[in-house]
């Protein structure tokens, strides 16, 4: 009975189908769906393409712009913020939003208008048929948005005089009901008249006359 030969010193071959070439090893997990040799730039990512990137899956994955996160060596050699376009954490600063593990998150479509700074917002609205002012409800071209905001917010609210209607005066354009004798009305500087309760409600969302919004 001969002794069983030892296999301790025998070189172990590669497993079938497994490459030992280091170049075939994929990048670390935090690179997600990015190609290591390419430049992403600013681009929209679908819901499926941002899975596994640190987003809370219990919430709706938002629309946003994403940039690839740099490697550990890039972050180590990035300095302490000497380059104003970079923060040393692997993504390029473009303004607005907040950053979440290798991407620039600017919020959902519904809230994008509220989160974008003014130097980025015109790009968004120019691609979406202008901008509707929340103060006066007028449609404004994106390149006039900042000026319009300043004028609209600094414009004083219209005043009016209370009065009691002495005779029927047609239709109130706010509630579309008749202005009848004895109704309490509001007379604006432009001489338009409305039910007092109607114009009070109107002024909560708009500072201009319903029939003369440009005044």
From Swiss-Prot:
One of its GO terms (molecular function) is ubiquitin-protein transferase activity. InterPro entries: Znf_RING (IPR001841), Znf_RING/FYVE/PHD (IPR013083), ZNRF_ubiq-protein_ligase (IPR051878). It is a peripheral membrane protein. One of its GO terms (cellular component) is intracellular membrane-bounded organelle. A zinc finger (RING-type) spans 172-213. The keyword Chaperone does not apply. GO terms for biological process: proteasome-mediated ubiquitin-dependent protein catabolic process; protein K48-linked ubiquitination. Keywords: Endosome, Lipoprotein, Lysosome, Membrane, Metal-binding, Myristate, Transferase, Ubl conjugation pathway, Zinc, Zinc-finger. The RING-type zinc finger domain is required for E3 ligase activity. E3 ubiquitin-protein ligase that plays a role in neuron cells differentiation. Plays a role in the establishment and maintenance of neuronal transmission and plasticity. This is E3 ubiquitin-protein ligase znrf1. It comes from Danio rerio (Zebrafish).
């Amino acid at each position: 009975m001969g002794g069983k030969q030892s296999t301790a010193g025998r070189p172990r071959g590669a497993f079938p189908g497994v490459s030992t070439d280091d170049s075939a090893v994929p990048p670390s997990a935090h690179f997600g769906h990015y190609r290591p040799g390419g430049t992403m730039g600013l681009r929209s990512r679908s819901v499926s393409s941002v899975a596994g990137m640190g987003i809370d899956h219990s919430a709706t994955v938002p629309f946003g712009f994403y940039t690839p996160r740099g490697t550990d060596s890039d972050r180590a050699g990035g300095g302490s913020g000497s380059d104003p376009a970079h923060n040393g954490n692997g993504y390029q600063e473009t303004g607005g939003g907040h950053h979440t593990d290798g991407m620039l998150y600017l919020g959902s479509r519904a809230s994008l208008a509220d989160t974008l700074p003014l130097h980025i917002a015109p790009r968004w609205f120019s691609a979406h048929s202008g901008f509707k002012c929340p103060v006066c409800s007028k449609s404004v071209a994106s390149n006039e948005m900042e000026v319009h905001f300043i004028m609209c917010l600094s414009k004083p609210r219209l005043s009016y005089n209370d009065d009691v209607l002495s005779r029927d005066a047609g239709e109130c354009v706010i509630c579309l009901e008749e202005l009848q004798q004895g109704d309490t009305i509001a007379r604006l500087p432009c001489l338009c008249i409305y039910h007092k309760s109607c114009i009070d409600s109107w002024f909560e969302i708009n500072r201009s006359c319903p029939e003369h919004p440009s005044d």
